[in-house]
Amino acid sequence: MSKKKTSRQTRTATKQNMNQRAPVTTMDAFSNPAARIGFGTMDLLQATEYPMTRMTQNYQLLTSLYRENWIIQNIIATIPNDMIRKWYDLKTSIAPQYLKEMVQLERKTQIRKKLLLGMYWGRLYGGAAGVILIKGQNDLSMPLDMDTVMPGSFLGLHILDRWNGIYPEGELVTDAEDPDFSLPAYYTIRNDETGTMVARVHHSRVIRFIGRELPWMEMVTEQYWGESEIEAIYDELVRRDNVAGNIAALTFRANINYQETDGLDQLLGASNTEIQRRFWNTMAAQSMMESNFGTRLINKGDAIHNTQYTFTGLPDVYDRVMMDVAGAARTPVTKLFGRSPAGLNATGEADLQNYYDYIDGLRETELRGIIERLLPVMALSAWGKMPDDMDIDFSPMQTPDAKDIADI
């Protein structure tokens, strides 16, 4: 083998070793420095940042928004109300005449209202819990014992939000067959005023309500709760409130009169305060007479002009802002703002159909698990036994009418 060939092979092997020792990471991006567009340039878009705010942890702000802003109240309440509105259909071999006992138990314990409150505060604060209360099971730190659930012993749910004294502990459920696998095994109920522990609750007695789902590490940061619905909507809400406020402020300038007065600069710049006082008294008297009689007296040689502001285009701007808020809230404009659809021949039926499909999905993924967790306890309390074939079903939120069926 020649020296030249050997040298070439040596250099090739050396390059391969260098590549193995020092891998080079490459990134693809668009950049046009001459036009100042793209990655690494002085482009205005490149200056955009998305800082981590974690607004869910700001209890004061969330509470203030909920109490003072009607849009926030609608965002928190609309979806839970629709999820609960048609309730569920119970499928079981129990005779129909006994089903009213379950209905009476639901009314007695106000289970619908308690679930609504849990969903409200879970969506507002990112987390809430409903503690299952059973007569005779006073030690809440023990797992829920179905064998000791007697007829009439189910007392309902006690709803606590994440800032109202219930705190997940660090120990997690390790049983992979448990529905609460990888979630806290115990919750501490504490009196925040005194700092004393009221109760330690086993996870089998807790119904969890969370806002928006978070990745695992972010959920740990939020103490195993979720994200407030308001955090993803806040920026759009600020834009809407400012647009509405500015439009309202413009109404005060819709019709403005202004007066031309000769020598006004010398008059205002005069050092004689008596002259200035007389001038302001004259202007005040003119304004009062105009307000009372619709007439304004001016000096000979003065002139009065009127300007009117046109609001053309502002309704379109406001509509676009409302659409952004509705999109962030996952709720149609017609339901969130209580207004009819804008535009020629607009009915909003397509938006409502998509929304109701979304609600049907939430009932299956979120509400079903909650009800199936409560049903065994409620059945034992209402009937004294748990039917083996008991199941639930949800009626569609929107069913086709006669016209829709005929069109099909």
Which stretches of residues belong to each language-model region?
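N-terminal-proximal low-complexity accessory segments that begin disordered
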Residues: 1-85
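Structured, mid-chain assembly/scaffold modules that mediate subunit interfaces
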Residues: 59-222
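Tryptophan-centered motif/residue detector
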Residues: 79, 185-188, 192-193, 304, ...
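Extended, charged amphipathic alpha-helical segments
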Residues: 200-347, 395-397, 401
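C-terminal amphipathic alpha-helical
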Residues: 111-131, 268-283, 310-407
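Surface-exposed polar/charged interaction patches
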Residues: 21, 36, 68, 72, ...
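Exposed alpha-helical structural elements
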Residues: 25, 61, 70-71, 83, ...
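Conserved aromatic-histidine-acidic binding/catalytic patches
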Residues: 27, 47, 54, 63, ...
